[in-house]
Amino acid sequence: MAELQEVQITEEKPLLPGQTPEAAKEAELAARILLDQGQTHSVETPYGSVTFTVYGTPKPKRPAILTYHDVGLNYKSCFQPLFQFEDMQEIIQNFVRVHVDAPGMEEGAPVFPLGYQYPSLDQLADMIPCVLQYLNFSTIIGVGVGAGAYILARYALNHPDTVEGLVLINIDPNAKGWMDWAAHKLTGLTSSIPEMILGHLFSQEELSGNSELIQKYRNIITHAPNLDNIELYWNSYNNRRDLNFERGGDITLRCPVMLVVGDQAPHEDAVVECNSKLDPTQTSFLKMADSGGQPQLTQPGKLTEAFKYFLQGMGYMASSCMTRLSRSRTASLTSAASVDGNRSRSRTLSQSSESGTLSSGPPGHTMEVSC
């Protein structure tokens, strides 16, 4: 038998000529993220079943990022533009993500039977421990929008030791007053449920402009096969209790918080009021110009930038690279840090619309983004 010989084959034309190892690593990461479709689970709770989707693998000594969406949306329609944004990939490779869908909001969800008692927002918050127990996760960083922001804030009040930080977009911590109820009832006589929800999600200026984004979400909500379920979630949101935040009082969020709202957004006044009631040493307030009612959809780059600095202020991603947004400017970053255990807990963001300089300022500072 002839002796086998080893033959070496060299590639005459590399597939990616001139590609650096760093670029190859980034391309591999992007492909891995693209192929990661997440694992969807359901767990029974005292208030019914809840569905959630997990992306990535748990990282030692790091919390999970847990999201909760607003009324009329699910986790994909609420958060995909943000978490698929290019600069966000540096964050999500460092944290496992849990995207919770409110009951009946997940894709393909059956319509609840007539007379079904939908959970209150407080009860939806009480479902989260069942999710974390199922996954064996001990702590989270919560990211919520609208009703989801309220739910995560309520959860943080009930379980402060399990929440390391909160990003609350468009939160309204107040129960509806009599005037709100009267306006809501009057609107209900002349507007459909989809139109009322769109008015909750977007500003009147956006709705009048009828951009492609508005057309897309109007179509999603109007033709949702689970519209009856959406109405139940909407009713629970409108029946929410007051969170009773009080600056300097016993009822407050005890973790770092970043409040986010768009300039002229439907919930701008509510978020401003919420900011006035929280601990200024723990709270950052990000008001985003030209972002409308859903900044995570319209300005994912700017929100990613702020989120990255928020995580750095908590002691994570200290070696994080600057994003394109900050590289395009003269950027300076300083920290005023107070140590809680081994972790820096006190950093707040500010941005000057005139100088375009990013910096960290004293706690309780407002960050207005108009770029």
UniProtKB/Swiss-Prot annotation:
Localization per record: Cytoplasm; Cytoplasm, Perinuclear region; Cell projection, Growth cone
Q: Give the compositionally biased regions (Low complexity).
A: 347-361
- In residue numbers, the region (Disordered) covers 1-21, 334-371
What does the record say about tissue specificity? Answer: Highly expressed in brain, heart, skeletal muscle and salivary gland, and moderately in kidney and liver. Expressed in dendritic cells, but not in other blood cells. Expression levels are low in pancreatic and liver cancer tissues; absent in meningioma. Expressed in low-grade gliomas but present at low levels in glioblastoma. Isoform 1 and isoform 2 are present in brain neurons and up-regulated in Alzheimer disease (at protein level).
Cellular component terms, GO, for this chain's entry? cytoplasm; cytosol; extracellular exosome; Golgi apparatus; growth cone; nucleus; perinuclear region of cytoplasm
Q: Which Gene3D superfamilies match?
A: alpha/beta hydrolase (3.40.50.1820)
Q: Which residues carry this modification: Phosphoserine?
A: 326, 328, 332, 335, 338, 344, 350, 352-353, 355, 370
Q: Give residue numbers for the modification (Phosphothreonine).
A: 20, 330, 334, 348, 357
- Which InterPro entries does the annotation name? AB_hydrolase_fold (IPR029058), NDRG (IPR004142)
- Keywords of this protein's UniProt record, alphabetized? Acetylation, Cell projection, Cytoplasm, Developmental protein, Differentiation, Neurogenesis, Phosphoprotein, Tumor suppressor, Wnt signaling pathway
Similarity field? Belongs to the NDRG family.
What this protein is called in its record is Protein NDRG2
Q: Which organism is it from?
A: Homo sapiens (Human)
